[in-house]
């Protein structure tokens, strides 16, 4: 995890809020560093994590996790991490006969209109364990990234339904957290992606939006991060708070600074 990002969010693994949905969004840049942050954050918080990885392999996340001080292999072996490798699973679903229901069952069903098998996978992965097994602080669902489901033929409404049922189970029933990534293509004609992004934005308690620089590439500033806290239960004056920082990604950390305050500029 990135300590500077924790400081900006005013949180640590031992005092994170529960029952929250965090939306990660990237536009004209790669926001995967946010996924790696939250994955390592919740593993260090001793949470039970269900990771639906639709865009990269387990080895990719494992290599980055080692740099951030967590072992995904050990976490999976001890039952703390349940990992659905979408790339590999998609091949199995399409080219191999499956007797048992598969989380990505919709890939081989032309008229599949829902993600119920994927939800059942998440619910089974995060259900409370018996008292004799390892006890985790609370469950966490992490998805990277939901936009892939649209590319695979699912509609935005079906994906939002999936998120609704996951929230009901993970956030409300089990008092856990959810973190999902959605890519913002910036294409005005991509109505499905806009519906998904807007729907999730209204449901989220925290939105982290990574954006590329309007001026283009810079060696010392890789992008900017917009942080939006949404607190519906608070008075109007304190309901939504937004801050913007620029950042530079390094090998094992990310540095954040106010706009125009890069050490290279000063």
From Swiss-Prot:
Q: How does it assemble?
A: Component of the elongator complex which consists of ELP1, ELP2, ELP3, ELP4, ELP5 and ELP6.
A GO CC annotation given for this chain: cytosol
Compartment list: Cytoplasm; Nucleus
Give the family per the record: Belongs to the ELP6 family.
* Protein name, UniProt field: Elongator complex protein 6
Lineage summary: Eukaryota, Metazoa, Chordata, Craniata, Vertebrata
Per UniProt, which keywords does this protein have? Answer: Cytoplasm, Nucleus, tRNA processing
Job of this protein: Component of the elongator complex which is required for multiple tRNA modifications, including mcm5U (5-methoxycarbonylmethyl uridine), mcm5s2U (5-methoxycarbonylmethyl-2-thiouridine), and ncm5U (5-carbamoylmethyl uridine). The elongator complex catalyzes formation of carboxymethyluridine in the wobble base at position 34 in tRNAs. Involved in cell migration.
Organism for this UniProt entry: Homo sapiens
- Name its GO BP terms in alphabetical order: autophagosome maturation; cellular response to stress; homeostasis of number of retina cells; inflammasome-mediated signaling pathway; locomotory behavior; motor behavior; neuromuscular process controlling balance; neuron apoptotic process
What the entry lists under InterPro entries is as follows: ELP6, P-loop_NTPase
Q: What is its main location?
A: cytoplasm
* Top-level taxon in the UniProt lineage: Eukaryota
This protein's pathway: tRNA modification; 5-methoxycarbonylmethyl-2-thiouridine-tRNA biosynthesis
Q: Name one Pfam family in it.
A: ELP6
């Amino acid at each position: 995890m990135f300590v500077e990002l924790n400081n900006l969010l005013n949180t640590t693994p031992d005092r994170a809020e529960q029952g929250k949905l965090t939306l990660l969004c990237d536009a004209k840049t790669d926001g995967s560093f946010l996924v790696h942050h939250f994955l390592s954050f919740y593993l260090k918080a001793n949470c039970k994590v269900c990771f639906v990885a639709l865009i990269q392999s387990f080895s990719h996340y494992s290599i980055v996790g080692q740099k951030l001080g967590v072992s995904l292999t050990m976490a999976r072996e001890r039952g703390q991490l349940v990992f659905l490798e979408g790339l590999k699973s998609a091949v199995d679903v399409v080219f191999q006969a499956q007797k048992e229901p598969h989380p990505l069952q919709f890939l081989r069903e032309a008229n599949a209109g829902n993600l119920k098998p994927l939800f059942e996978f998440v619910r089974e992965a995060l259900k409370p364990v018996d008292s004799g097994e390892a006890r985790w602080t609370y469950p966490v669902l992490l998805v990277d990234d939901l936009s892939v489901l649209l590319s695979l033929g699912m509609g935005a409404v079906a994906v939002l339904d999936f998120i609704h049922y996951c929230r009901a189970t993970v956030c409300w029933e089990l008092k856990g957290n959810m973190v999902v990534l959605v890519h913002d293509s910036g294409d005005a004609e991509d109505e499905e992606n806009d519906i998904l992004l807007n729907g999730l934005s209204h449901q989220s308690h925290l939105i982290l939006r990574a954006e590329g620089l309007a001026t283009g590439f810079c060696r010392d500033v890789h992008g900017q991060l917009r942080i939006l806290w949404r607190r519906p239960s608070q008075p109007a004056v304190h309901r939504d708070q937004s801050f913007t920082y620029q950042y530079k990604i390094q090998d094992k950390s990310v540095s954040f600074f106010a706009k125009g305050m890069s050490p290279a500029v000063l």
